[in-house]
């Protein structure tokens, strides 16, 4: 179980039919492939296979945030590409199906050692309590809270980029291998997720959210030694001394973005303490993946 939110940092994808069966795929590099099987980008190739598309396409992606930074860009890419391909075929698709299909591709087809959180929040958007069942089912429960609480929480959250990028697969593989050794800690993290949701929905002292964020980070660090490192620990301690009540490293660990909960009157001091990091302004995003435009000349 996790408490998760979408933010206003986006992955943009365009899909355009090409003459013949050749593909042009643009991301951090550009591929020109003679057919679907020759595409090197594993997610693009797998999405095309999943939907049975062989006719040539031009697929281009642009992202607000770099990859390998813990904000779910890979799964957002998968969800967005599936959504665009379904639209190209003239199909409307639900958030549930998008998330399920993205998980099928990343976890089962590509054997990535990842969970399902990123795919579901990318598809649904909003602020969600996401529950993962032993049988593979996923339940997405929106947090029902007041506009005032939402705005106040946003005022108290500050996001910093550490400048460190990393491949999450190795970290997540090790975490998966040791899961059975940390069932008590994982159950505690689930309880904290519920408590954090309750703080938001009940109108209780919002600072409790920050304290729970700190508790969850301390537990998560104990799950696997590579989740944090000396640089991350130093930044975190500096933030606490500057007035932050809690925080966490987003994503699998070892780099990416640090999120802190800090009351407004301490935030200037927090920014000074972490002047070596890059602050990234953000806001909560209520919508998940959406199709912005579909041309009239398809087919």
Region spans (language model):
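C-terminal nucleotide
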Residues: 4-53, 62, 85-113, 117-247, ...
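Glycine/serine-rich anion-binding loops at beta->alpha junctions
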Residues: 62-85, 243-258
């Amino acid at each position: 179980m996790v408490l998760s939110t979408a933010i206003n940092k986006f992955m943009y994808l365009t899909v355009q039919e090409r003459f013949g069966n050749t593909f042009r795929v643009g991301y951090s590099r550009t591929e020109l492939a003679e057919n679907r099987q020759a595409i090197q980008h594993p997610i693009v190739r797998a999405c095309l296979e999943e939907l049975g598309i062989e006719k040539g396409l031009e697929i281009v992606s642009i992202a607000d945030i770099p990859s390998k930074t813990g904000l779910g860009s890979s799964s957002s890419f998968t969800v967005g590409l599936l959504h665009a391909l379904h639209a190209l075929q003239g199909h409307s698709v639900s958030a549930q199906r998008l998330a399920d299909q993205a998980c099928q591709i990343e976890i089962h087809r590509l054997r990535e050692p990842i969970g399902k959180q990123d795919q579901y929040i990318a598809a649904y958007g909003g602020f969600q309590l996401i529950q993962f069942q032993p049988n593979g089912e996923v339940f997405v429960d929106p947090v029902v809270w007041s506009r005032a609480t939402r705005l106040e929480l946003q005022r108290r959250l500050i996001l910093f980029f550490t400048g460190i990028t990393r491949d999450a697969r190795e970290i997540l593989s090790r975490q998966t291998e040791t899961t059975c050794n940390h069932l008590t800690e994982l159950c505690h993290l689930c309880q904290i997720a519920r408590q954090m949701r309750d703080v938001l929905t009940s109108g209780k002292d919002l600072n409790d959210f920050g304290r729970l964020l700190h508790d969850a980070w301390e537990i998560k660090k104990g799950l696997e030694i590579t989740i944090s490192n000396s640089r991350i620990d130093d930044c975190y301690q500096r933030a606490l001394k500057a007035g932050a009540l809690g925080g966490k490293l987003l994503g699998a660990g070892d780099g990416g973005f640090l999120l802190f909960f800090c009351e407004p009157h301490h935030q200037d001091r927090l920014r000074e303490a972490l002047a070596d990091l890059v602050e990234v302004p953000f806001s909560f995003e209520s919508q998940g993946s959406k199709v912005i435009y579909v041309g009239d000349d398809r087919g």
